[in-house]
Amino acid sequence: MVPIGPQGPGFSTIQNKRYDALIASAAAHYSLPAALIKAVIARESAFNPKAVSKAGAQGLMQIIPATAKEVGLKDPFDPVQNIFAGSRYLRILLNRFDGNLMASLAAYNAGPHQIKDAYGIPPFPETLNY
């Protein structure tokens, strides 16, 4: 279980275990905490592998087509491909932002260009609540 919630850490837990083995594998492959990947999936798609956002983001980790191309994702609705591609992208962002988790998560949500343009976390309500 991962402590998360709209008010911050500790207000609710993620109990969906369906993808735990895939998450653990991707976490080991990309040197990420499994809890981080699981929290992103919970926030992005609520564990719905068929989720599609208004912006066109797809799958468990809600990857937009341009990012899918960047990380080599062929089928965004395949949980294995999506979790590994989303985890790869998280690793890319963490490397780009020198391990700054807040900036990396904001970039995952709003796009890395928004972080650079805002000189930090952009003032979008969705990103601030992310």
Predicted regions and their residues:
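Catalytic glycan-binding domains that act on GlcNAc-containing polysaccharides
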Residues: 2-130
